[in-house]
Regions:
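Nucleotidyltransferase catalytic core that binds NTPs
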Residues: 1-207
Length: 207
């Protein structure tokens, strides 16, 4: 079995997240993509909706697609030192010992991978599917760092097919300042946000 692991804030989940997961699933012939929302305890994230709110939005959005599987592995962690991508991949590997795991990441974070906590171990141990982002050249990034060069065969690229990006921070700001981003997110996510008055604030931090 071939499994992609797609971690993100999903704050909120957008159609871009779903398009990305499904594009990788199709182009790399994966059996499923496990979608992992980040825990609010993570120090490298500035999250706005709670763990449970983001879990509900994700679960509602993928309920009709068995190949997109939400996971609570990070949300249920109580120890901050376990909230690292390498630890998540280790856990999923133990849960799926016969599967080939692929870490899904955007091209914009590729250059930072060696600087992540346990980033070296992550790069050495797993295969990566890098999703194209406008303005980022994967070949140049890989050649620019000795660790990435040494494991360049661990990285493959997926083109999403379009350059436009709709960030979660843009969605949050639309809600906060009276906009109506209903056509940028799934209906179930839009309705959940409205029902629970999420992101209804004056000033928001960007991701």
């Amino acid at each position: 079995m071939r499994i992609g692991v797609y971690g993100s804030s999903f704050d909120p989940l957008t159609y871009i997240h779903l398009w990305t997961a499904n594009s990788v699933l199709q182009h790399k012939h994966l059996d499923k993509v496990i979608m992992v929302p980040a825990n609010t305890k993570r120090q490298d994230k500035s999250l706005h909706a709670s763990n449970e709110q983001r879990w509900e939005m994700l679960s509602l959005a993928v309920a009709d697609n068995p190949k997109l599987e939400p996971s609570r592995i990070e949300l249920d962690q109580t120890q901050r030192d376990l909230l690292y991508s390498y630890k998540t991949m280790e856990y999923l590997h133990r849960e799926n010992p016969d599967a080939e795991l692929f870490f899904i990441a955007g091209a914009d974070i590729l250059a930072e991978l060696p600087n992540w906590t346990l980033g070296k171990q992550l790069i050495e141990a797993y295969q990566f599917i890098i999703v194209s982002r406008d303005g980022y050249d994967m070949g140049k990034i890989l050649s620019g760092h000795p660790l990435l060069r040494a494991y360049d065969d661990h990285f493959s690229l997926v083109y999403k097919g379009f350059a436009n990006e709709v960030s979660s921070s843009y969605i949050r700001e639309e809600f906060a300042y009276g906009g109506d981003p209903r056509y940028l997110i799934p209906d179930v996510v839009y309705n959940y946000i409205q029902q629970h008055n999420i992101y209804q604030r004056g000033v928001l931090n960007h991701e």
